[in-house]
């Protein structure tokens, strides 16, 4: 009975924890003069279960606080509702409406309903030491093990230095949304201060709404005024989302315009470079065209000069003279009158006559007619060959005499004797050589060619015929 009463007394302060901070809760519970638990024997009224001993086996203060805060926790099977006064700022969850709001009169009633549990069945409103609303009796369910474990090792400094810790801000800036989405007791155990804020959000839990200059300008343009403290209403959240969406669109448009401007600037630079290059190429083309025109003019001038030099007609007389000269140069080596003059030159060669033995024998038996000496010295006649003079020199032996008169007589005598010795056949052979050649129409360079060309038997026959004619 005493345990139930003490449990009821300790459960009632949980209803008043909503507007209080953690340090105020400790002062309210353990104050020696005005504390709620100043007359309660804690060592006899709390009996720890085996499960609680497994969770916190080595800390008496942990067992005490777990036993205090355990009945005040909400049932795990009950749905978790996000409080309306949450500090989540701009909500990015699914769109919420009036159906998402838990049944209740307001934020205060939701917190009280979640944290107030009567100690006995059938009791009325929860007793509280601060003004608060009445808590409706929830359906009785089986109380499970607390899903919130508070580590008091971090609170030991609070009890030792309450003034320093009261002024210091919370080291965990987790929102209610993040704690609810975590969905596990381990996260709450890792962040005990955040769990205490979730259980009882106080005045220090509120955050300021920080707006940029662009947001303020757009809000002023829209004619909407937002509060400086979170949380915001759904309408205010929608307005703030709309403003921030406009700012993002504006920034993206500015970025796109900036990129477009940079791209256009690059194109303009390239265009200017291409224009300068095009102008340079045009100047080169004009220069080349001028050079081409000058070359064409020079070519036309040269063509005119060539045409003037080749336009004169060739005379017919010149062509005929060239043809005759060519013909003469071709035919000249085979023309005989030119070769006769060459043969008549005395220094070319000396012909040698060979007399046949047969003619010598016949000549010795013949008697040559008397030759009448004349005033002229006998010798070769005109038109005779040089070989005749040579033969005459062989047969004439004129001795050298002292007296010129005797020389003339002796010369005549020697000539007569030589004529007799030579014979008629030899003389006829000499005389008949030139007429025979003239009759045959053969004009050869010398007699040696005639002697070498005519066979011996034919030569004898010709000589005999010549003698018969004479």
UniProtKB/Swiss-Prot annotation:
<comment type="subunit">
    <text>Binds DNA as a dimer. May form homodimers. Interacts with ATF6. Interacts with SYNV1/HRD1; this interaction leads to CREB3L3 ubiquitination and proteasomal degradation.</text>
</comment>
<keyword id="KW-0325">Glycoprotein</keyword>
<keyword id="KW-0812">Transmembrane</keyword>
<feature type="glycosylation site" description="N-linked (GlcNAc...) asparagine">
    <location>
        <position position="417"/>
    </location>
</feature>
<protein>
    <recommendedName>
        <fullName>Cyclic AMP-responsive element-binding protein 3-like protein 3</fullName>
    </recommendedName>
</protein>
<dbReference type="InterPro" id="IPR051381">
    <property type="entry name" value="CREB_ATF_subfamily"/>
</dbReference>
<dbReference type="GO" id="GO:0000978">
    <property type="term" value="F:RNA polymerase II cis-regulatory region sequence-specific DNA binding"/>
</dbReference>
<feature type="cross-link" description="Glycyl lysine isopeptide (Lys-Gly) (interchain with G-Cter in ubiquitin)">
    <location>
        <position position="290"/>
    </location>
</feature>
<keyword id="KW-0805">Transcription regulation</keyword>
<keyword id="KW-0238">DNA-binding</keyword>
<dbReference type="GO" id="GO:0000976">
    <property type="term" value="F:transcription cis-regulatory region binding"/>
</dbReference>
<comment type="function">
    <text>Transcription factor that may act during endoplasmic reticulum stress by activating unfolded protein response target genes. Activated in response to cAMP stimulation. Binds the cAMP response element (CRE). Activates transcription through box-B element and CRE. Seems to function synergistically with ATF6. In acute inflammatory response, may activate expression of acute phase response (APR) genes. May be involved in growth suppression. Regulates FGF21 transcription.</text>
</comment>
<dbReference type="GO" id="GO:0042802">
    <property type="term" value="F:identical protein binding"/>
</dbReference>
<feature type="region of interest" description="Basic motif">
    <location>
        <begin position="241"/>
        <end position="270"/>
    </location>
</feature>
<comment type="similarity">
    <text>Belongs to the bZIP family. ATF subfamily.</text>
</comment>
<feature type="topological domain" description="Lumenal">
    <location>
        <begin position="341"/>
        <end position="470"/>
    </location>
</feature>
<dbReference type="GO" id="GO:0016020">
    <property type="term" value="C:membrane"/>
</dbReference>
<dbReference type="GO" id="GO:0045944">
    <property type="term" value="P:positive regulation of transcription by RNA polymerase II"/>
</dbReference>
<dbReference type="GO" id="GO:0005634">
    <property type="term" value="C:nucleus"/>
</dbReference>
<dbReference type="GO" id="GO:0046982">
    <property type="term" value="F:protein heterodimerization activity"/>
</dbReference>
<feature type="glycosylation site" description="N-linked (GlcNAc...) asparagine">
    <location>
        <position position="410"/>
    </location>
</feature>
<keyword id="KW-1017">Isopeptide bond</keyword>
<feature type="topological domain" description="Cytoplasmic">
    <location>
        <begin position="1"/>
        <end position="319"/>
    </location>
</feature>
<keyword id="KW-0832">Ubl conjugation</keyword>
<feature type="site" description="Cleavage; by PS1">
    <location>
        <begin position="359"/>
        <end position="360"/>
    </location>
</feature>
<keyword id="KW-0804">Transcription</keyword>
<dbReference type="InterPro" id="IPR004827">
    <property type="entry name" value="bZIP"/>
</dbReference>
<keyword id="KW-1133">Transmembrane helix</keyword>
<keyword id="KW-0735">Signal-anchor</keyword>
<keyword id="KW-0539">Nucleus</keyword>
<dbReference type="GO" id="GO:0006986">
    <property type="term" value="P:response to unfolded protein"/>
</dbReference>
<dbReference type="InterPro" id="IPR046347">
    <property type="entry name" value="bZIP_sf"/>
</dbReference>
<dbReference type="GO" id="GO:0000977">
    <property type="term" value="F:RNA polymerase II transcription regulatory region sequence-specific DNA binding"/>
</dbReference>
<keyword id="KW-0834">Unfolded protein response</keyword>
<dbReference type="GO" id="GO:0034976">
    <property type="term" value="P:response to endoplasmic reticulum stress"/>
</dbReference>
<dbReference type="GO" id="GO:0042803">
    <property type="term" value="F:protein homodimerization activity"/>
</dbReference>
<keyword id="KW-0472">Membrane</keyword>
<dbReference type="GO" id="GO:0005789">
    <property type="term" value="C:endoplasmic reticulum membrane"/>
</dbReference>
<dbReference type="GO" id="GO:0001228">
    <property type="term" value="F:DNA-binding transcription activator activity, RNA polymerase II-specific"/>
</dbReference>
<keyword id="KW-0256">Endoplasmic reticulum</keyword>
<dbReference type="GO" id="GO:0000981">
    <property type="term" value="F:DNA-binding transcription factor activity, RNA polymerase II-specific"/>
</dbReference>
<dbReference type="GO" id="GO:0005783">
    <property type="term" value="C:endoplasmic reticulum"/>
</dbReference>
